[in-house]
């Protein structure tokens, strides 16, 4: 019998990643026995592994997160290559966030949203309430000063939020989650990058067929040619993958 409340770990470049079989497995893992886990979720793709390799501070932030999972198809393929018996599938961060929000709405779990432009954040809140009746207990757009961080942490703590999602891009969101947990430790934190923009339709995500083929990165590159410099970095990751240096 499969235990959906547990998940194996697979190490890439010294970082242990959770191997979820699918979205259902991920949700059952995070809500094991009806209790939402506490800690930090970090989506891992090839670009983030490269950054962690070159930036000790980013690596420390990622290493400290309890729940590191394979968000990028290249990472999933590397796990399968290194561990042939691994039953792991890609769980995209944007999809996991939506699934968490739907589950939170069903369970009445209090949610605090951080990040994004004011108008995008407002639209995100409205859509979450309408679509899944999410219990949003507070929010803060991404435009606040370093001096206002402690006040934000106090608000999050006072709200009693059990899920805190932060859309500020990496590594800003990981830094904020790390510091906020010192004030409000009993919650599940999730860095979500540009997910609010996608959720509200301000940014178009790759069509499903591109996602299913593992070509979402190519769709983004064709849509945003300026990403070519970032994509060129991935040649280094490909070398790791094909030489078994993971």
Curated annotation (Swiss-Prot):
Keywords: Glycosyltransferase, Transferase. The keyword Transferase applies. Pathway: Bacterial outer membrane biogenesis; enterobacterial common antigen biosynthesis. Its EC number is 2.4.1.180. Belongs to the glycosyltransferase 26 family. It catalyses: UDP-N-acetyl-alpha-D-mannosaminouronate + N-acetyl-alpha-D-glucosaminyl-di-trans,octa-cis-undecaprenyl diphosphate = beta-D-ManNAcA-(1->4)-alpha-D-GlcNAc-di-trans,octa-cis-undecaprenyl diphosphate + UDP + H(+). This is UDP-N-acetyl-D-mannosaminuronic acid transferase. Catalyzes the synthesis of Und-PP-GlcNAc-ManNAcA (Lipid II), the second lipid-linked intermediate involved in enterobacterial common antigen (ECA) synthesis.
């Amino acid at each position: 019998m499969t235990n959906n409340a547990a998940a194996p770990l697979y190490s890439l470049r010294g970082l242990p990643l959770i191997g979820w079989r699918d979205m259902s497995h991920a949700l059952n893992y995070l809500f094991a026995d009806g209790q939402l886990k506490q800690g930090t979720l970090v989506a891992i793709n090839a670009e983030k592994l490269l950054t962690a390799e070159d930036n000790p501070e980013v690596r420390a932030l990622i290493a400290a997160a309890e729940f590191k999972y394979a968000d990028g198809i290249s990472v999933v393929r590397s796990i399968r290559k290194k561990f042939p018996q691994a039953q792991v599938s890609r769980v995209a961060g944007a999809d996991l966030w939506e699934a968490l929000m739907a589950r939170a709405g069903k369970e009445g779990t209090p949610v605090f949203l951080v990040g994004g432009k004011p108008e995008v954040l407002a639209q995100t809140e409205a859509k979450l309430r309408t679509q899944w009746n999410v219990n949003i207990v507070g929010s803060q757009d991404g435009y606040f000063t370093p001096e206002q961080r402690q006040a934000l942490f106090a608000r999050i703590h006072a709200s009693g939020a059990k899920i805190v999602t932060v859309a500020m891009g990496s590594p800003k969101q990981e830094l904020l989650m790390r510091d906020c947990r010192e004030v409000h430790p009993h919650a599940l934190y999730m860095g979500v990058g540009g997910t609010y923009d996608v959720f509200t339709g301000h940014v178009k995500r790759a069509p499903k067929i591109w996602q299913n083929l593992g070509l979402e990165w190519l769709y983004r590159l064709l849509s945003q040619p300026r990403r070519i410099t970032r994509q060129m970095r991935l040649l280094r990751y490909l070398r790791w993958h094909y030489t078994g240096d993971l």
